[in-house]
């Protein structure tokens, strides 16, 4: 391994000799400098680095050399080409948190959503145009003469493992490309081969909804760039730096969402593609589970339905959709109205009084705020819930944050003093002395790790010091819970089922989550390659028995994918019938599921 690294370094040096700086275009020079900065970021602050080396066989030096060669061997590269190389460089980490976004507006999409069934077929489940020869329930066979599976293979990132989450990401990209995410954007028409439900096949020509790039390419304007001229009498008008507070880019302040989420949200908004299949959709794509007895109005899709068990007995079951943990991104969120955790609390109080069990739909959830996640979990339990710990990459940035917490809470010794310092709640999680003590403990643990040099991948630390989620003082749902998950649950949406599963609080049903298992930090830096932001993972979450969430995801108790009939007819009847059967078992067997020898129920 050491000889391989030496060889790669020699190769890099040799490449530099044979590619003199003066022979490189301005665009290439800028991209190489930005690549070097990204490499430095990964070396210093990317927590899963060692894990990626073991799990993927990924190597930072080798990946960097490969990207350099791509940039140097392309004659007069365009900015978009360089952006694609940098996106692929970070994409090789196979990390849903890690990625670069760009200042670019070129995009293209086809107004269709496709979903894969349990038998490996691809069906159209949503048509977002008034005029189309394609219908819901049609099967997608080929794209431009190539089988769908082969086309998806070209959309995977390097070092992919072929997981369901990776395939879903490729499937999402199949009909939606954005230069802001480093995609190569198509235009014109493409040919889709489809099969109707009754068996006939046909080819349909469809046109990409294309938006051209409006940001001029640096490669085009480079010849016109002149060195700036300053008059001797010119005075400086640069504003003074405000040092009144510490503006942190540390791992403690960024939402836990995939790197593409902001760009995808913007794409949904600007293209008008409103669909229940969208990530973060308020309603989701599942139909109601039965006759509706009660229904909420507001930010959450929530209702009570009557469900009949195998003995003909009727049960009242609650259904609640949690679309996102980025509460400010909720589709109907009104900043002037009550916060979502207050509405959530009212819904849970109704469920506590009027249901025998609760189904939570958390499919297609992008993640979000960890404190908001804790707030919701605190209302779904009547006992403390143990939390995963985090192995962190620590820098002086995190040390200053730890000192800030300790200074803020230095003389806090009561519930009242805790609320004076922190407010009544932290994104819905009730503040008391225990919260203040957790935060102080967190600060002390960070400082202790720093003083011992335990900074590269620290001893596991509870995030924000929260060893446990404690029940909400007034709202505590204590009846059986069934949580529906899938491969498009990211980050906080990985942690929600982890906490409930590892504490035996809920039955987890569906398919394995995406596996974005750590905290996120974002970096912005001046550049001319059009990089808007770089998002990386700053910690590795560790479950109770030492298992990572990163890349692995959360395995459900009951694996339940969607069948072809579920998807083709858009009723998901087979899926929901099994879910209702499981919930009735939970109700009738005191929260226990009885499986047959073959795993059926």
Swiss-Prot record:
GO terms for molecular function: endopeptidase activity; serine-type peptidase activity. Coiled coil: none annotated. It holds the Pfam family PDZ_4. Gene3D superfamilies: 2-enoyl-CoA Hydratase, Chain A, domain 1 (3.90.226.10), 2.30.42.10. Signal peptide: none annotated. GO terms for cellular component: outer membrane-bounded periplasmic space. CDD domains: Peptidase_S41_IRBP (cd07563). InterPro entries: ClpP/crotonase-like_dom_sf (IPR029045), CPAF_PDZ (IPR041126), PDZ_sf (IPR036034), Tail-specific_protease (IPR005151). GO terms for biological process: proteolysis; signal transduction. It comes from the Bacteria. Belongs to the chlamydial CPn_1016/CT_858/TC_0248 family. NCBIfam families: chlamy_CPAF. This is Protein CT_858. It comes from Chlamydia trachomatis serovar D (strain ATCC VR-885 / DSM 19411 / UW-3/Cx).
């Amino acid at each position: 391994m050491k000889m391989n690294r030496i060889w790669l370094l020699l190769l890099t040096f040799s490449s530099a000799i044979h590619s003199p700086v003066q022979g490189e275009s301005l665009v290439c020079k800028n991209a190489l400098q930005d690549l070097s900065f990204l490499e430095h970021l990964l070396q210093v602050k990317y927590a899963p680095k060692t894990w990626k080396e073991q799990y993927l066989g990924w190597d930072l030096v080798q990946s960097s050399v490969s990207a350099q060669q791509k940039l140097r061997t392309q004659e007069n590269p365009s900015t978009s080409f360089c952006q694609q190389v940098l996106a692929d460089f970070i994409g090789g980490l196979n990390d849903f948190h890690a990625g670069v976004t760009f200042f670019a507006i070129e995009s293209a999409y086809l107004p269709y959503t496709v979903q894969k069934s349990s038998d490996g077929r691809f069906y159209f489940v949503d048509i977002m145009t008034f005029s189309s020869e394609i219908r819901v329930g049609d099967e997608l066979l080929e794209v431009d003469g190539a089988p769908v599976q082969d086309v998806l293979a070209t959309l995977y990132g390097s070092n992919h493992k072929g997981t369901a989450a990776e395939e879903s990401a490729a499937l999402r990209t199949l009909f939606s490309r954005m230069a802001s995410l480093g995609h190569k954007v198509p235009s014109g028409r493409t040919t889709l081969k489809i099969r109707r439900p009754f068996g006939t096949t046909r080819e349909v020509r469809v046109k990409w909804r294309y938006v051209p790039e409006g940001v001029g390419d640096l490669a085009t304007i480079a010849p016109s760039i002149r060195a700036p001229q300053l008059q001797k009498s010119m005075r400086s008008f640069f504003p003074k730096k405000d040092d009144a507070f510490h503006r942190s880019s540390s791992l403690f302040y960024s939402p836990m969402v995939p790197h593409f989420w902001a760009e995808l949200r913007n794409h949904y908004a600007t293209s008008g593609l409103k669909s229940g299949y969208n990530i973060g959709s308020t309603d989701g794509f599942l139909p109601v589970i039965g006759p509706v007895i009660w229904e909420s109005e507001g930010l959450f899709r929530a209702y009570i339905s009557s469900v009949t068990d195998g003995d003909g007995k009727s049960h009242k079951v609650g259904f609640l959709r949690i679309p996102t943990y980025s509460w400010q991104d909720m589709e109907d969120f009104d900043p002037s109205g009550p916060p979502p955790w207050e509405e959530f609390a009212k819904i849970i109080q109704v469920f506590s009084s009027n249901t025998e069990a609760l189904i939570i739909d958390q499919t297609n959830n992008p993640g979000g705020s960890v404190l908001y996640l804790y707030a919701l979990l605190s209302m779904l339990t009547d006992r403390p819930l143990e939390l995963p710990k985090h192995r962190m990459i620590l820098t002086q940035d995190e040390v200053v944050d730890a000192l800030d917490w300790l200074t803020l809470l230095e003389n806090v010794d009561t519930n009242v003093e805790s609320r004076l310092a922190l407010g009544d709640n932290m994104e819905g999680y009730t503040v008391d002395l225990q919260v203040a003590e957790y935060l102080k403990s967190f600060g002390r643990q960070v400082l202790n790790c720093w003083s011992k040099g335990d900074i590269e991948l620290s001893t596991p630390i509870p995030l924000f010091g929260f060893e446990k989620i404690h029940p909400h003082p007034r709202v505590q749902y204590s009846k059986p819970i069934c949580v529906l998950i899938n491969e498009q649950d990211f980050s906080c949406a990985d942690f929600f089922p982890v906490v409930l599963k590892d504490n035996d609080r809920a039955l987890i049903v569906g398919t394995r989550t995406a596996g974005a298992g750590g905290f996120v930090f974002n970096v912005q830096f001046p550049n001319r390659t059009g990089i808007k932001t770089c998002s990386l993972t700053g910690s590795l979450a560790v479950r109770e028995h030492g298992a990572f969430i990163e890349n692995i995801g959360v395995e459900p108790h009951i694996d339940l994918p969607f069948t072809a009939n579920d998807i083709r007819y858009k009723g998901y009847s087979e899926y929901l019938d099994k879910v209702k059967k499981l919930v009735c078992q939970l109700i009738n067997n005191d929260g226990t599921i009885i499986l047959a020898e073959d795993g059926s129920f």
